[in-house]
Design a protein with these regions (language model features):
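Structural motif
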Residues: 61, 85, 165-166, 191
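Conserved beta-strand hairpin/beta-sheet module of binuclear metal-dependent hydrolase folds
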Residues: 2-49, 147-169
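Metallo-beta-lactamase
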Residues: 2-4, 87-161
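Cap/insert and terminal regions of metallo-dependent hydrolase folds
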Residues: 83-86, 171-199
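Pre-active-site segment of Zn-dependent metallo-hydrolases
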Residues: 21-61, 72-77, 134-138, 172-185
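Divalent metal-coordination and catalytic microenvironments
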Residues: 19, 29, 64, 71, ...
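Active-site metal-binding loops of divalent metal-dependent hydrolases
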Residues: 30-32, 65, 129-130, 168-170, ...
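Active-site HxH/HxHxD metal-binding segment of metal-dependent hydrolases
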Residues: 47-116, 133
């Protein structure tokens, strides 16, 4: 791995994070298009310099298919050489299909809980969904309904850094916490959802 220790991390908005390391510019869960979800959701505070947020992008990680984490309108402006990394769970094949339709071909479906080298200086490990609904309510435990868990997180490791980005992957189910606790040993930065609905 590279000997460079410098890493820059910017929280652009919501779960949208920009990470600069060596020759990589990684965007996680890019979202800047206002009016998603029937014009109800807006980027706040507003991001006025979109070019600055996405300039130089080389890699993108998308944790799940929701529009506040997967903004196809924004991603159509990325270079066609951009490499995309998506957890290989249902329904993320739809993300891959839409990216193909936009002209992107460097799309990698990542297995859960497995270290995947991104070049020679970075490793991704997808954290599995730790919730069904993402709602903070005891009634969900009692509900006789099974949701479709899709909110994944990312553990990003370099030779000098360990960063965990949970996005919307709220750790509600305690049976998953032992594995997560082991992964987070000596983590440098942990990004958690600030409520049960959005990161």
């Amino acid at each position: 791995m590279s000997r460079n220790k410098d890493i820059k991390i910017y929280n652009i908005s919501n779960a949208f994070v920009r990470i600069e390391y060596n020759d990589k510019v990684l965007l996680c869960d890019p979202w800047l298009t206002n009016g998603i979800f029937d014009k109800a959701w807006m980027v706040y505070p507003p991001v006025y310099d979109v070019d600055k947020a996405i300039n130089g992008v080389t890699h993108v990680f998308i944790s799940h298919i929701h529009k506040d984490h997967c903004d196809f309108n924004l991603m159509r402006h990325f270079p066609k050489t951009t490499e995309f990394y998506i957890p290989d769970i249902f329904p993320n094949d739809k993300i891959k299909l839409q990216l193909n339709n936009l002209g992107f071909n460097n799309i990698h479906m990542l297995p859960i809980n497995k270290d995947i080298s991104i070049g020679s200086d970075m490793v991704f490990n997808v954290i599995p969904p730790m919730n069904m609904y993402g709602h903070e309510t005891e009634e969900m435990v009692k509900a006789n309904i099974n949701g479709v868990p899709l909110d994944c997180g990312l553990l990003l490791t370099t030779e000098f850094h360990k960063i965990c980005i949970l996005a919307d992957d709220s750790p509600y189910y305690f049976d998953h916490l032992t594995d997560l606790h082991e992964k987070l040993n000596k983590v440098d930065l942990l990004m958690l959802p600030y409520n049960g609905y959005a990161a």
